[in-house]
Amino acid sequence: MEHSTEILYNKTEVYCSAVHRFGSDALLLARFCEPKRSQTAADLCSGCGIVSLEWHDRGHRGPCAAVELQPEASALLQQAVAEQGIGHITPHLADLRSFREGEGQFDVCACNPPYFAAGPQSAKAGRATARHETDCTLEDVCACGFRLLKDGGRLALCHRPCLLYTSPSP
């Protein structure tokens, strides 16, 4: 598979494609909710695996499940972890709406979900899936996090600020 390589601070390589790449929001999310060295972690809507790989680059060595719906994106992460011998990150080609592996066992779940519920979509299917709620909604992400997290676990999302406002009840 044709890809470009981005190198993180401590030399971990992230494989990207024209459709599956990452932005600063994913790096900020990874740093915001960074798991402790041996904690169990899940990277939902993992794309090319930037959150999981950033955690690894910064010292996380606990089990990490990276759940991604799109085969090309999941394959990029699979290739990156295989070629670099990163055994604690397990890419899962799966729909988070039905993902159940490790239920109730995770300390940290992170997700940089699709941001847009409506509006014009890219003609490229992969880009549309990554940016628009075509295959999962914010509610789906929260439900998956709830299933996977242990008591006291943390779910961290990077989302549009306008969705944080809820009008007061009358």
Regions found by a protein language model. Name each.
Residues 1-36:
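Class I SAM-dependent transferase core
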Residues 31-103, 108-111, 117-122:
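Conserved SAM/SAH cofactor-binding pocket of Class I
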Residues 113-140:
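Mobile active-site "lid"/loop adjacent to the S-adenosyl-L-methionine
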